């Protein structure tokens, strides 16, 4: 990575359930960060068009109505919508990592995915990361990512990657991201919460009422940074109370909480709550070198002779055309001679049987 690079965390509220207006707000935020000379800007989980805080809504018919609206306001990659975002990153000369709900690019599908879209400073789409396993009630909203979503991107500022929310608690995924050479990590979340005894008991964090240390985000991100020796830009969604639909009140956790840490888990910017802001920090590659001198997860502190990680599987495709078995030409010649037929005739027979 570069010896010094300025990065930014965009704690800005989406225009809830309005794709076009939220894209417009994203472009204005990208422009502002570009003027501040940031080279990487990270938005919150599902910034476009907002997190589905209605995910557990009853009755199911009302949930279904929300789901259809969510589909209509989700992002297709690529599309004219991503072109608008790409133009903004090109003009601002920065890389953007944008949390979004993505609608499937598979013909005939309306499935949604919890995605981070990465766009380069040249306006080209670097790629995407789809959340591998939606959490709890999220499985009623989003599909699952696959092996193609375990990836990093080599850029002029360094090797960047990102994962979503509770993926930061997936030990093997963290190890995979480190093994892929990630240097700068983009972490996205739906908010900041107080957790009472277990993950199923959450409420929105209120700075004047609660201790932020009850939220697992802070510990997960600082440990991710230390374990992988990466810089982490962590962005949690913020939606003001007065803009949160009443239907979503039971799962209103959108308190913000963006922060930035170095590879030792030390704050470069501490968490900020309940307001829109862009946090900036200068990343110093020497922080990473110092940490790796003490604890290098891919070098002198690794024991690959004892413990190794395997990436398995292939990208999921609905249609797979079976490849025909190819016989070795010398084997065909021997078989033709054995049965007294021409090689060309044997090839035709095998082809008709579908095995040649």
Placement of each model-derived feature along the sequence:
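Short beta-strand scaffold segments in enzyme catalytic cores
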Residues: 98-100, 114-118, 151, 258-260, ...
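A short, polar/charged loop-to-alpha-helix boundary motif
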Residues: 131-145, 275-294
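Short hydrophobic alpha-helix segments
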Residues: 122, 128-129, 271
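Cys-nucleophile CN-hydrolase/nitrilase-fold catalytic domain and related Cys-dependent amidase chemistry
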Residues: 19, 31-122, 191-223, 227-228
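CN hydrolase (nitrilase-like) catalytic-core segments centered on the catalytic cysteine
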Residues: 75-97, 159, 168-279, 346-350, ...
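Cysteine/selenocysteine-centered motifs that mediate thiol-based redox chemistry or coordinate metal-sulfur cofactors
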Residues: 151-183, 187-189, 288-356
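N-terminal glycine-/serine-/threonine-rich phosphate-binding loop
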Residues: 1-40
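Active-site-proximal beta-strand elements of phosphoester/diester hydrolases
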Residues: 4-16, 115, 128-130, 152, ...
